């Protein structure tokens, strides 16, 4: 999360809660797939760059937990397991599968790439499609990575690291203080197979095969005991001609309005910005 985002967390009074879970990387390093350093950002922890709003890396679940903690004093009620079956865009109001109806001054449709709200607005189903890109993620416990390990520098010097190669790129960063998240975004093309909605368990050897000739550091991390591999499909949606209702009281935001493929893993920010 860049300072523009954490500054808002600060204004909302939840930054201290986020900091309980977040990591403050020192820099971002861009490498070739073989490990050669191509470019390095200035130290993102430098107070002259980030002022009082830090650059953070945080697990999404921990971020949501912190945001949830800040809702109690603002009269926010969160209803889980609520299936929306109908939206009246003029009132505006929505109806749940239970028959309950809720009216509001404005409704924001933020239900992701498989948005039901988008289909309601367009008047027809509008499913996302896969261009053939997939994500492999390995979560590596760093507790047993010692000074003798080739990946020690990634643990000792907290940073966001990118490796860029043919057909894909990898990004790594620390989460939960002692877990290294390694994410491979890979273009498998038309042969990507059956779409996988959301992370599903995958064979670590499948990940290894994709990066067989990449930096040895990556190979060693894949082999750390306790590493867990998951995989899912990336989706896009067709470009929308409209994402708001003419009444001005309903609008789509986030992936419901503009799901796109990641570019060097800046992907979460387009959806975070309108949501914030």
PLM regions with names:
Residues 20, 27, 35-38, 219-220, ...:
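C-terminal helical "tail/cap" subdomain of flavin- and related membrane-associated enzymes
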Residues 44-51, 189-193, 235:
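Short glycine/proline- and charge-enriched loop/turn segments
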Residues 57-58, 101, 130, 269:
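Short aromatic/basic micro-patch
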Residues 1-70, 74:
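Active-site-adjacent segment of FAD-dependent monooxygenases/related oxidoreductases
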Residues 34, 65-226:
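Conserved FAD-binding catalytic core of PHBH/FMO-like flavoproteins
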Residues 108-109, 172, 206-207, 228-276:
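Conserved mid-domain beta->alpha element of the FAD-binding
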């Amino acid at each position: 999360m860049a300072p523009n985002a954490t500054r808002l967390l600060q204004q909302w009074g939840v930054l201290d809660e986020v900091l309980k879970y977040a990591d403050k990387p020192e820099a971002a390093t861009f490498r070739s797939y073989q490990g050669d350093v191509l470019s390095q950002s200035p130290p993102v922890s430098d107070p002259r760059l980030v002022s009082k709003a830090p650059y953070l890396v945080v697990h999404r679940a921990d971020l949501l937990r912190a945001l949830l903690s800040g809702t109690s004093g603002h009269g926010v009620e969160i209803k889980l397991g609520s299936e929306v079956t109908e939206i009246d865009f003029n009132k505006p109001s929505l109806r749940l599968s239970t028959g309950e109806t809720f009216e509001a001054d404005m409704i924001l449709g933020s239900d992701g790439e498989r948005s039901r709200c988008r289909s309601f607005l367009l008047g027809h189903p509008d499913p996302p499609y896969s261009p053939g890109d997939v994500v492999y993620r390995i979560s590596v416990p760093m507790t047993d990575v010692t000074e003798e390990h080739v990946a020690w520098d990634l643990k000792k010097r907290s940073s966001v690291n990118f490796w860029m190669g043919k057909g894909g790129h990898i990004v790594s960063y620390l989460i939960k203080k002692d877990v290294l998240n390694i994410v491979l975004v890979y273009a498998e093309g038309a042969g990507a197979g059956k779409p996988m909605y959301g992370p599903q368990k995958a064979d670590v050897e499948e990940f290894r095969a994709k990066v067989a000739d990449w930096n040895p550091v990556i190979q060693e991390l894949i082999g750390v005991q306790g590493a867990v591999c998951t995989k899912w499909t990336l989706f896009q949606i067709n470009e929308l001609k409209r994402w708001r209702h003419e009444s001005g009281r309903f609008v789509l935001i986030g992936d419901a309005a503009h799901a796109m493929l990641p570019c060097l893993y800046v992907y979460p920010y387009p959806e975070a910005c309108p949501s914030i």
